[in-house]
Amino acid sequence: MANNGNLLRENNTTPTITWIGHATLLVQMDGVNFLTDPIWSNTPSPIPFIGPSRWVEPGVELADLPAIDFVVISHNHYDHLDLPTLRELAQLNTETEFFVPMGNADLLQKNGISRVREMNWGDSINVKGTMVHCLPTQHWSKRSLNDTRKSLWSSWAITGPQKRFYFAGDTGYFDGFKDIGDKFGPFDLAAVPVGAYEPRAMMKATHMNPEEAVQSALDVRATTAVAMHYGTFDLSDEPLSEPPLRFKAAAEKTSLGSWVLAIGETRSF
């Protein structure tokens, strides 16, 4: 679904979410615009011509975005921390702030991105009256041969005067979701990863399957969950078309509202 960004740039009041692709979401709420794990590159890899390439182009061009107040990054894997995209975002708007888990600020700063704030689990910061909370998740980090788990990974809660949004990042299912729901919920909307779960024996600890994604949204006390982290890059063994079907089927057995957006689609919440 092509989205030229016109309505997004004009929007100052309606809370919306737009799926750019993979774990990249544009959220507009309570007077702020922010991105999650932005990647516009064709290949998430240290070597651009080696690795999984996009199956679908980004839903909105970078240049067509509204002014971005801040970016949240879940961890340093190449499909979530994409330096070419981050550099371009920093150039497009010198006021954009970049929030990263502990151990990741140096990487951005060495690449010319100065407005970086490193956060630990439990840290919070106020942006224009909206709170950004760095929270636990169950994953790992690695960007080169000798840096496995040397930087932190996280999920994020964005809580404003009117709306509350949860971004699960990349994660396996864990009991911490219930704690997040108790402390920061309920959420109007939770973005949960539903892809990259096969083979299950290898992926289970760090990647939820669609049924677990539904349970995670229930645990954080979300009214509605939106599926993400699927259908953009072929990262694992399940068919690209399978995750949203299983996600919808699992959600329909519960009280949870479930959204499967087309890439580029905007929906209000």
Residue ranges and their predicted role:
Residues 1-12, 20, 29-76, 83-91, ...:
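Pre-active-site segment of Zn-dependent metallo-hydrolases
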Residues 1-12, 101-163, 246-266:
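Metallo-beta-lactamase
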Residues 14-16, 93-97, 164-165:
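Short active-site oxyanion
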Residues 25-28, 126-188, 204, 208-211:
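Catalytic core of the metallo-beta-lactamase
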Residues 31, 38-40, 102-104, 136, ...:
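A mature extracytoplasmic/lumenal domain signature
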Residues 36-37, 97, 114-123, 189-192:
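Short hydrophobic/aromatic-enriched beta-strand-loop microsegments
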Residues 62-68, 76-82, 107-122, 168:
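Conserved N-terminal glycine/acidic-rich loop preference
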Residues 70, 77, 97-99, 103-106, ...:
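Cap/insert and terminal regions of metallo-dependent hydrolase folds
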